[in-house]
Amino acid sequence: MHMTDVLPAGDISKAVEAFAAPDSFNHKKFFEMCGLKSKGPDVMKQVFGILDQDRSGFIEEDELCLMLKGFTPNARSLSVKETTALLAAGDKDGDGKIGMDEFVTLVSES
């Protein structure tokens, strides 16, 4: 499954382009711009499944770094600062990774 199977390609492109500059990523604005925030939990879970590249049931720090690439392959990687901030925002139980429920909460609260 590809991200464009669940979200409009145009919205994804606009969102990724808006945060092309290093250290410009804002997860709240990104989730809104790509259209994910307005979707229900089922779509959010599909997106989680795409971002969880190793199928561990969690999005770990190395996968968070590649999050924009999960939306479109030619996107940049997140910086260490951006990755750390995203993990801090989403990791509600402090285990160093983001589970599916945490991801849905992260997107919904954005």
Curated annotation (Swiss-Prot):
Name of a matching Pfam family: EF-hand_7
Binding site for Ca(2+) 1: 52, 54, 56, 58, 60, 63
Cellular component aspect of the GO annotation: cytoplasm
InterPro entries with a match to the protein in the record: EF-hand-dom_pair, EF_Hand_1_Ca_BS, EF_hand_dom, Parvalbumin
Classification via PROSITE patterns: EF_HAND_1, EF_HAND_2
SMART domains tied to this protein: EFh (SM00054)
Binding residues annotated for Ca(2+) 2, in chain numbering: 91, 93, 95, 97, 102
GO molecular function, one term: calcium ion binding
Domain of life: Eukaryota
Disulfide bonds: none
Key words of the record: Calcium, Metal-binding, Muscle protein, Repeat
Domain EF-hand: 39-74, 78-110
Additional free-text comment from the UniProt record: This parvalbumin has an isoelectric point of 4.97.
Biological function: In muscle, parvalbumin is thought to be involved in relaxation after contraction. It binds two calcium ions.
Similarity-based family: Belongs to the parvalbumin family.
Stored PANTHER family: PARVALBUMIN ALPHA
Record's protein name: Parvalbumin alpha
